[in-house]
């Protein structure tokens, strides 16, 4: 009986720590090796106030990255002298000039060229040999007025050409006598019925014959149309000389730009 109790006591005695086999994790590796690879720091509980040390290799790599990031910024940074050179100012001036030219769209040039083929307008231009009512600047103002009125190009008809030409003469010419002839060409009168002096026109109206009454009513209607056309341009009838030259520069070889009073001898 004593021997049996002695064996039982020997089986329950703890074995030395060196002989105990280390516990293994579910993956089959020792638990101590896994903890040493993943956890760093003291085994005692608590938080270490000192930050973890970074290796010199990481610091050197971070410095190289910072230097590589700074290099494109240095290359892309413009020099301050290139911003304030005179060429930049000239470029801005040319850009503003192109913007002013774009106000007159090509469709208004096409409408102007289409109306030049009108037989009544052809007769007016052929009659005005002295260029008193249709020189190149007055005709360029017609294109400017078409642009300012803002109608679609296909809507411009013969009446609009005469309205614009008459309004251009109102703005630029002081002599009223030649301007009155525009009425007669508009209403397709013959050359023999066109008075050359303004006094002859008032003399016709004074007698108040049926033909004179008809002419007076047509002139009154024309002036009414002229007022509406002037309002459609927002009362902007003045055109600068620079804008007129830019309109002519769109097609400098056009035959109407040869109608220059300076070339008359």
Swiss-Prot record:
Composition bias, Acidic residues: 66-80
Family the UniProt entry places it in: Belongs to the Speedy/Ringo family.
GO molecular function terms listed in the Swiss-Prot or TrEMBL record: protein kinase binding
Gene: SPDYE12
InterPro entries linked to this entry: Speedy
Protein known as: Speedy protein E12
Highest taxon of source: Eukaryota
Segments for region (Disordered): 1-80
Low complexity composition-biased segments: 13-23
UniProt xrefs under Pfam families: Spy1 (PF11357)
Lineage: Eukaryota, Metazoa, Chordata, Craniata, Vertebrata
């Amino acid at each position: 009986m004593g021997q049996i109790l002695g064996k039982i006591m020997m089986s329950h005695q703890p074995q030395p720590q060196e002989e105990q086999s280390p516990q293994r994790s579910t993956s089959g590796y020792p638990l101590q090796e896994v903890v040493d690879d993943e956890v760093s720091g003291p085994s005692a509980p608590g938080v270490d106030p000192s930050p973890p040390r970074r290796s010199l290799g990481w610091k050197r790599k971070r410095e190289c990255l910072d230097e590589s990031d700074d290099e494109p910024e240095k290359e892309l940074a413009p020099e301050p002298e290139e911003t304030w050179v005179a060429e930049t100012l000239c470029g801005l001036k040319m850009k503003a000039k192109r913007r002013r030219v774009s106000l007159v769209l090509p469709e208004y040039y096409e409408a102007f060229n289409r109306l030049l083929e009108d037989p009544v307008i052809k007769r007016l231009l052929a009659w005005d040999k002295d260029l008193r009512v249709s020189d190149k600047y007055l005709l360029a103002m017609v294109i400017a007025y078409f642009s300012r009125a803002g109608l679609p190009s296909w809507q411009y008809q013969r009446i609009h050409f005469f309205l614009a030409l008459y309004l251009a003469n109102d703005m630029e010419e002081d002599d009223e006598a030649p301007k009155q002839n525009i009425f007669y060409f508009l209403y397709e009168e013959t050359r023999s019925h066109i008075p050359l002096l303004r006094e002859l026109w008032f003399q016709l109206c004074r007698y108040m014959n049926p033909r004179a009454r008809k002419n007076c009513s047509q002139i009154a209607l024309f002036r009414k149309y002229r007022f509406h056309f002037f309002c459609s341009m927002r009362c902007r009838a003045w055109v600068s000389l620079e804008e007129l030259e830019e309109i002519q520069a769109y097609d400098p070889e056009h035959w109407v730009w040869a109608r220059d009073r300076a070339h008359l001898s």
